[in-house]
């Protein structure tokens, strides 16, 4: 499948960008619906998104470029060209979370409450955006003879984009269910996302052939471990607070 969806005035519009845009739009719709359940206005969601989205893209690109600096130091003109890929999701999430924190402080909003609203939307956006990797023929895995293998350059490989896309979608469904039916404290949905996505990404990353490295270590696996631990700590901390509150 061609990476280029169509051209306008000689400018190629890539499928990668279209899928990311679709993920953002559907994620926004989800966030607005969840926000209404918390009596938070659509304008508040939009105010955060206007800043978080572009900074997330910058963060995702910066993260990727930093760990591929040997290449980009010799090709500086390509640093800002993201039409063909080269966005690292962890960099984007970190930038978006920091942005959300700053805005919440300025607007006197509960930070974890807002993150709980955005996390299901992020998971859905990831599930959709991963298909851009399929079209770009990137982020695939090691050779395999499994029935669902895809063929890249004549070699059957693990469709790791598909593993993560399906995993992200299942995480999205679970987070929405818990948000609507079983949420007990602010930060619950966020910590669930951290644990579930961290586990998913750790194992999927182990199959990929294009991982970013620090020495012999895969960067995303190290980040995944840190995020899982942080998510578990967050869950334990607030569950203890609930137990103490119930005992009073």
Curated annotation (Swiss-Prot):
Primary subcellular site in the record, as a coarse category: membrane
Keyword Cell membrane: yes
UniProt cross-references to Pfam families, sorted A to Z: LGT (PF01790)
E.C. no: 2.5.1.145
Keywords on record: Cell membrane, Membrane, Transferase, Transmembrane, Transmembrane helix
Membrane-topology descriptor: Multi-pass membrane protein
Enzyme class: transferase
PROSITE patterns on file: LGT (PS01311)
Compartments, record wording: Cell membrane
Molecular function per GO: phosphatidylglycerol-prolipoprotein diacylglyceryl transferase activity
GO BP term, pick one: lipoprotein biosynthetic process
CC terms in the record's Gene Ontology section: plasma membrane
Source species, domain of life: Bacteria
Pathway: Protein modification; lipoprotein biosynthesis (diacylglyceryl transfer)
TM regions (residue ranges): 6-26, 48-68, 84-104, 187-207, 214-234
Binding sites annotated in the UniProt record for a 1,2-diacyl-sn-glycero-3-phospho-(1'-sn-glycerol): 130
Function, as annotated: Catalyzes the transfer of the diacylglyceryl group from phosphatidylglycerol to the sulfhydryl group of the N-terminal cysteine of a prolipoprotein, the first step in the formation of mature lipoproteins.
Stored PANTHER family: PHOSPHATIDYLGLYCEROL--PROLIPOPROTEIN DIACYLGLYCERYL TRANSFERASE, PROLIPOPROTEIN DIACYLGLYCERYL TRANSFERASE
Entry's family note: Belongs to the Lgt family.
Name recorded for this polypeptide: Phosphatidylglycerol--prolipoprotein diacylglyceryl transferase
């Amino acid at each position: 499948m061609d990476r280029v969806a169509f051209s306008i005035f000689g400018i190629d519009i890539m499928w990668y960008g279209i899928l990311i845009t679709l993920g953002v739009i559907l994620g926004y719709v989800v966030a607005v619906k969840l926000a209404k359940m918390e009596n938070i206005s659509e304008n508040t969601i939009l105010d955060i998104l206007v800043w978080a989205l572009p900074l997330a893209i910058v963060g995702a690109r910066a993260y990727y470029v930093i760990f591929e600096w040997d290449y980009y130091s010799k090709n500086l003109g390509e640093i800002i060209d993201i039409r063909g890929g080269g966005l690292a999701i962890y960099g984007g999430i970190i930038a978006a979370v920091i942005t959300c924190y700053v805005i919440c402080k300025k607007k006197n909003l509960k930070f974890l409450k807002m993150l709980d609203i955005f996390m299901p939307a992020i998971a859905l956006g990831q599930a959709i955006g991963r298909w851009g990797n399929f079209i770009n023929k990137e982020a695939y895995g090691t050779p395999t003879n499994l029935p669902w293998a895809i063929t890249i350059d004549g070699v059957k490989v693990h469709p790791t984009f598909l593993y993560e896309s399906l995993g992200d979608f299942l995480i999205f469904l679970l987070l929405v269910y818990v948000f609507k039916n079983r949420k007990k404290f602010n930060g619950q949905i966020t910590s669930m996302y951290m644990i579930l996505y961290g586990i998913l990404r750790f194992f999927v990353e182990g199959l990929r052939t294009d991982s970013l490295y620090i020495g012999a270590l895969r960067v995303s696996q190290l980040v995944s471990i840190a995020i899982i631990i942080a998510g578990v700590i967050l869950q334990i901390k607030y569950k203890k607070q609930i137990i103490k509150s119930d005992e009073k």
